[in-house]
UniProtKB/Swiss-Prot annotation:
Entry-linked PANTHER family: 40S RIBOSOMAL PROTEIN S15A
SUPFAM superfamilies, sorted: Ribosomal protein S8 (SSF56047)
Organism expressing this protein natively: Metallosphaera sedula (strain ATCC 51363 / DSM 5348 / JCM 9185 / NBRC 15509 / TH2)
InterPro entries the record matches: Ribosomal_uS8 (IPR000630), Ribosomal_uS8_CS (IPR047863), Ribosomal_uS8_sf (IPR035987)
Keyword check for Transmembrane: no
Species classification: Archaea, Thermoproteota, Thermoprotei, Sulfolobales, Sulfolobaceae
Protein name: Small ribosomal subunit protein uS8
HAMAP family registered for this protein in UniProt: Ribosomal_uS8_A (MF_01302_A)
NCBIfam families with a match to the protein in the record: PRK04034.1
One GO biological process term: translation
Subunit structure: Part of the 30S ribosomal subunit.
Keywords for this protein: Ribonucleoprotein, Ribosomal protein, RNA-binding, rRNA-binding
GO function term, MF aspect, one: rRNA binding
Top-level taxon of origin: Archaea
Length: 133
């Protein structure tokens, strides 16, 4: 079976396991982008520790869930935003987050994967990947 969007599959797997009240989630196939998104989610306190398991094929990621994810998902198509658009992100916040203070939009920038708040602080634009709250 062909996997079209691995990031979308990973985020929906996290959300589904969270809704089933599981303590762990296994994400496969893994990629560097998924690991970087998980680091951002871990720094924001949405997931616990995670580890890469090499199975000789694509690899798996075992993620410890903390019960803090209400909703998460990938934003498709992946829009490119400039710094000025990153500061005034009201369309994306209104569409994907319940309020300005709750949740984050995950952005891939030239300085790495980070939240939309960090990207605005560092004065950089990037590509919108997903959201979590």
């Amino acid at each position: 079976m062909t996997v079209i969007n691995t990031l979308s599959n990973a985020l929906s797997s996290l959300y589904n396991n969270e809704m089933r009240r599981n303590k762990q989630a296994i994400i496969m196939p893994s990629s560097k982008l998924i690991v970087n998104v998980l680091r951002v989610m871990q720094k924001e306190g949405y997931v616990g520790e995670f580890e890469y398991i090499d199975d000789g094929r694509w690899g798996k990621i075992l993620v410890q869930l903390m019960g803090r994810i209400n909703k998460c998902g990938a934003i498709t198509p992946r829009y490119s935003l400039t710094y000025r658009e990153m500061i005034s992100l009201p369309d994306y916040i209104r569409r994907y987050l319940p309020s300005k203070e709750i949740g984050v939009i995950i952005v891939s920038t030239p300085k790495g994967v980070m939240t939309h708040k960090e990207a605005a602080r560092q004065r950089t634009g990037g590509i919108v990947l997903g959201y979590v709250y």
